[in-house]
């Protein structure tokens, strides 16, 4: 018999201790991984709801199971809010992740072996944009494009590659690029060779929703995103489009269900719905503006302290520190900062001499610290402490001093007040 008072702590203390340990880690560590954020208690309430019990294969009004009258309302709310927030006229809220959303787009629009132009993973792209170890690189003929010597997307290179290889699809979007993308220019290049323009805006979706970063939806044939990262919702994916016909949208829907997924996760879709509503609030815009300000403030400190930032700055929520000149590996920098309770991720930099398992850089993002309430002053202090650690990654006494400062500021700015 199920009872509402059942809990994990009493039944499975081994698991509960690990879960509580993660709560403490999040409260006592500064989170700078660009793809991570703190979701709201409302989203977590949705994800822990009885919606998790409901199977709902199909789409609202066209289900393969009975008893879907309430989950239809939930999914339709998420669809309508996604369309309103991003100016789309099509939305699919069922993908379990950004990678699943991307896989569905490939499946809908391409045949195995088709040529695709995607951003090189080593220069800022994503695994699903054609990395040889990913399904995208295994199933399709990938032609990578990259950045120029100034660290900016090389549109001339994209245009030349497109003209030469005649791709069926060009992918815009990134996982480690700190500049703005000219979506109109990307569409112009795609149109010149009759290719689809597919944009993966996962990293900057929250900034786009708030009008802080250019919106690709009016320019692309199809757009995907995650619902976490800057959007600060549950872990999941979305597919959006504007200006397509019903046949095009039917292809996209079919590629999600039944093409690549079965039943949707209705508890997660409820979390997406509430996160999309939160993203429509005026304070969400203020939050995203602060995300950009904090990233810029941190870049200023790193540059002043003699550190190299790829492309020399940032126009979004993230930036890459290039540590080649400092002769520090990304792996060692990541570990040293971790000992000071500062969490980053090692990341390859353009023309990186080291392997992807070691790297010569770290990726830094401001969404999570901004969610805690950090403003420019705190962001600058934090960047200074990071420089103190990186100036001598073997000075354990100094790392311990920085750790104490981190613990103090974390107590002052709790994740969940």
Curated annotation (Swiss-Prot):
The modification N6-(pyridoxal phosphate)lysine is found at residue 229. Disulfide bonds: none annotated. The record marks 228 as: Plays an important role in substrate specificity. Pathway: One-carbon metabolism; tetrahydrofolate interconversion; Amino-acid biosynthesis; glycine biosynthesis; glycine from L-serine: step 1/1. Pfam families: SHMT. It is found in: Cytoplasm. It catalyses: (6R)-5,10-methylene-5,6,7,8-tetrahydrofolate + glycine + H2O = (6S)-5,6,7,8-tetrahydrofolate + L-serine. InterPro entries: PyrdxlP-dep_Trfase, PyrdxlP-dep_Trfase_major, PyrdxlP-dep_Trfase_small, Ser_HO-MeTrfase, Ser_HO-MeTrfase-like, Ser_HO-MeTrfase_PLP_BS, SHMT-like_dom. PANTHER family: SERINE HYDROXYMETHYLTRANSFERASE. Belongs to the SHMT family. NCBIfam families: PRK00011.1. Catalyzes the reversible interconversion of serine and glycine with tetrahydrofolate (THF) serving as the one-carbon carrier. This reaction serves as the major source of one-carbon groups required for the biosynthesis of purines, thymidylate, methionine, and other important biomolecules. Also exhibits THF-independent aldolase activity toward beta-hydroxyamino acids, producing glycine and aldehydes, via a retro-aldol mechanism. This is Serine hydroxymethyltransferase. It comes from Proteus mirabilis (strain HI4320).
